[in-house]
Amino acid sequence: MATGGAAGEDVPGGGEFYLRYYVGHKGKFGHEFLEFEFRPDGKLRYANNSNYKNDTMIRKEVFVSPSVLREARRIIQESEIMKEDDNNWPEPDRVGRQELEIVMGNEHISFTTSKIGSLVDVQTSKDPEGLRIFYYLVQDLKCFVFSLINLHFKIKPIQS
């Protein structure tokens, strides 16, 4: 695990910040997955692998500002995911798996569960409240990361 640098120290509450999310499965088209991570030095890494119709893996890396790391940390703190436990969540299966790892300050959590198709899967689980928090946090984080990646790679610099 990387240690916090200047970017990690600039987040509310101080200390290290690291986040990694993975969702994927192995099936008809091979190993298909989506993965992203925020590193303490501000590097955002993104990978999307789909072999459907012979697509190739998409990999993007970008450095984000301390304010972006603060926003990612705020999203996580407001979700209260750090209070949850994945013991009663569905185990990964042939449909796929999800992993979420977060380090904030001196707290470190790591969740593993199956792919969640819809809120019906959440409501019928043994821990619907905890899994609902996970489900919505993942939706928020994916939206945040997709926006950052799309903005960074589509916006052209202003020529003066």
From Swiss-Prot:
GO CC terms on record?
Answer: cytoplasm; exon-exon junction complex; nucleus
Expression induction per the record is: Induced by gibberellin, abscisic acid (ABA), auxin and brassinosteroid.
Q: In which tissues is it expressed?
A: Expressed in root, leaf and developing seed tissue.
The UniProt entry, under Gene3D superfamilies, shows:
Mago nashi
Keywords (alphabetical) are: Cytoplasm, mRNA processing, mRNA splicing, mRNA transport, Nonsense-mediated mRNA decay, Nucleus, RNA-binding, Translation regulation, Transport
Where does the UniProt annotation place the signal sequence? none
Q: What biological processes does GO assign it?
A: mRNA processing; mRNA transport; nuclear-transcribed mRNA catabolic process, nonsense-mediated decay; regulation of translation; RNA splicing
- MF (Gene Ontology): RNA binding
SUPFAM superfamilies in UniProt = Mago nashi protein
Q: Where is it located? A: Nucleus; Cytoplasm
Which Pfam families does the annotation name?
Mago_nashi
Name where it mostly resides.
nucleus
State the family named in the UniProt similarity comment for this chain.
Answer: Belongs to the mago nashi family.
Q: What does this protein do?
A: Core component of the splicing-dependent multiprotein exon junction complex (EJC) deposited at splice junctions on mRNAs. The EJC is a dynamic structure consisting of core proteins and several peripheral nuclear and cytoplasmic associated factors that join the complex only transiently either during EJC assembly or during subsequent mRNA metabolism.
The subunit field of the Swiss-Prot or TrEMBL record says: Heterodimer with Y14A. Heterodimer with Y14B. Part of the mRNA splicing-dependent exon junction complex (EJC); the core complex contains MLN51/CASC3, EIF4A3, MAGO and Y14.
PANTHER family documented for this protein: MAGO HOMOLOG, EXON JUNCTION COMPLEX SUBUNIT-RELATED, PROTEIN MAGO NASHI HOMOLOG
Q: What is this protein called?
A: Protein mago nashi homolog 2
